[in-house]
A protein has these predicted regions:
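Alpha-helical transmembrane segments and membrane-interface helix-loop junctions
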Residues: 1-164
Length: 164
């Protein structure tokens, strides 16, 4: 089971990383386009380089970035790589770790549930971004796999630690 969970969360994190790379590439190209436009307007670059920035590229970044972050959380949760404060370490530490994993599972499930409700509300209202008219619910939907994945991984960790 561990291998299946590991592969699933690695795949989700890899997808998030690839989308992040695409956003970085888009931002770099948009910046180069803006530089070309300003350079052509100033007269120190040819007009053929005056392509300008992408129209509202920040809206794409704004919709995609939360989903990218949520795509990484299940892998971080599986590997216990969150920032930690070592309190109450000692004989009761394994039990405390199980309790914290249960708390994390409940917290991520609550977050995923609320994201789902928010997405449903945005779908009903038809809210779109201002310039590109992209449906806002797309950003919410990008967060759901990672949020539910983190809840499932935390519950899996709790069971695994309880059995150890």
């Amino acid at each position: 089971m561990r291998v299946g969970v590991e592969r699933a969360v690695q795949g989700l994190a890899l997808a998030g990383g690839l989308i992040l790379l695409a956003l970085v590439g888009m931002t770099v190209l948009s910046s180069l386009g803006a530089l070309g436009l300003k350079g052509a307007q100033a007269g120190w670059l040819p007009q053929s380089l005056a392509i300008g920035p992408y129209k509202a590229g920040y809206e794409i970044v704004e919709l995609a970035l939360p989903g990218i972050i949520f795509a990484m959380i299940p892998l971080v949760q599986l590997r216990h790589a969150h920032a930690r404060v070592e309190l109450l370490r000692g004989r009761g530490a394994p039990t405390l770790d199980v309790v914290w994993q249960i708390v994390a599972a409940a917290m991520f499930a609550l977050i995923a549930w609320r994201i789902g409700l928010g997405m449903a509300g945005k779908m009903r209202s038809g809210t779109e971004t201002f310039l590109l008219a992209l449906p806002v619910w797309w950003g919410y939907s990008a967060c759901l796999p990672g949020a539910w994945g983190a809840a499932i991984v935390a519950a899996y960790n709790a069971v695994r630690l309880a059995r150890a």
